């Protein structure tokens, strides 16, 4: 009986610590009604780089290793989304094509060859594909405080 009780407590603790939420939110919750038009954000990114915004986009992929990054498409742009202080993760698979609303700071960043290779490795690219990455890349990036994924 004592072992059953202990096992029950462990199951509850495990489920609580590993389920980030049940409403589609990951990280800090935020008001999705404050959503900004992406076109307006994009037009002002050069003037106000690294400012806080809430935008939406279609999820293209997420890190299949830990869920520690994802790529979204907003309008015609692809944005690399990372999570503040690695404080939360998104599902590693099954969210491609879903809509994400993200809250945080958008910027234009020069990604190093090492970082690009790391992301390619996480994404399961072949050794040959990884070795072809030889130049840094300027990219739209987003450091998210919180993410809302529809259909979860």
Predicted segments, located by residue:
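Bacterial Sec-dependent N-terminal signal peptides
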Residues: 1-23
């Amino acid at each position: 009986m004592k072992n059953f009780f202990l096992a029950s407590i462990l199951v509850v603790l495990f489920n609580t610590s590993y389920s980030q939420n049940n409403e589609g939110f990951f990280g800090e919750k935020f008001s999705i009604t404050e959503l900004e038009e992406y076109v307006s954000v994009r037009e002002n990114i050069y003037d106000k780089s690294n400012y806080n915004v809430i935008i939406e986009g279609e999820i293209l992929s997420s890190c299949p290793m830990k869920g520690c990054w994802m790529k979204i498409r907003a309008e015609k742009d692809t944005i690399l989304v990372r999570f503040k202080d690695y404080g939360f993760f998104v599902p590693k698979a099954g969210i491609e094509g879903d809509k994400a609303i993200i809250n945080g700071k958008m910027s234009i960043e020069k990604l190093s060859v090492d970082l690009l290779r790391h992301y390619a490795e996480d994404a399961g690219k072949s050794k040959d594909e990884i070795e072809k990455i030889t130049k840094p890349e300027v990219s739209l990036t987003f450091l998210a405080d919180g993410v809302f994924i529809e259909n979860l």
